[in-house]
Amino acid sequence: MRGVTARGPGDAWAVGYRENAAGVDVPVAEHFDGTAWRATTVPGHAGNGELDAVLARGRADVWAVGSWDDAPARQDRALARHWDGARWREVPLPAEPARRSAYPLALAPGRGGEVWAVGVTAEDRVAAPRPLAYRWDGERWASVPPAGTEDEALLSGLAADGAGGLWAVGVAYGEQGEGRPLAEHWDGAAWRSVPAPHTAGRGEALDGVTALAPDDVWAVGASSPPDGTGTRPLVLHWDGAAWTREEVPDVAGQPHAVTGDGAGGVWAVGEREDATTPAFSLHRDAHGTWRLVPPADGAAGEGASFFDVTRVPGASPGGPALWAVGSTLPRLDPPWRPVVQGYGIRGPGA
């Protein structure tokens, strides 16, 4: 499972992909109705595909994006699906040039009925990455190039800022391939790059972002030494004027996603550097105190990763509730299995 969204205690969606009996990746979309998670039929394109992000604007207005493998053209193409309350239908996304693949990775609501997606394009699937941004205006998707599209970079997180704008985060690559945090802001008219702190001598990237207010935005990712070992969480905060680094508990691993807790704090979820260990969660309360929160128990010897997290509005009278999704990697041997965990949610499906 790669993405999750919730509108309330009886309306949540999780998306991802699975390998079918023929060894082909096909999309997965499951809905939680307050009692249990149930699979929906979501066709791929040309018999394949995967979904990386989902956004629910209403019970009959849900978007999911990802990519599908166009084998004859030797490129991956962007994929968008829309749920109308009864079924998923495909909606065309902008086409990329020959041999240039496109991967939308995150979704967020814009002004009015707009929906935005950000991600990356790449030549021959992996070379010369460039950030992408698509906007749905109620009738069609169109490309709105991010700032700095001449640089090798990608965008993997997106959030509405509460004032009609958007924050997109990811990574920009230097001449030697070293990563540095990338943050871009949409002000309603154009994208602009906003400087983000970077630790010299370390490769750093942002993966997820959430905005509690225009002057209270959180971004999470990874900070690693040149050899790639010893990865530690990277957490940045925007106060309306500048991005600053936040000190968090020392964990060997990285957060992939972040969301508000509904009480002035935030949750960040991710994976540990040792893939045989459980996923991890970090919580910051409204007073600024961070703590490490263990996930639910998994099977012995089974590692797990969280890739996305969302708050469930009104889910628990005792406090905010969350859904986190990801996958397991039993004993480091495929196949991966989906993980869906609830925090502060009692009853079936938790």
Residue spans for each PLM region:
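Residue-level hotspots at or immediately adjacent to binding/recognition sites across diverse folds
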Residues: 1-350
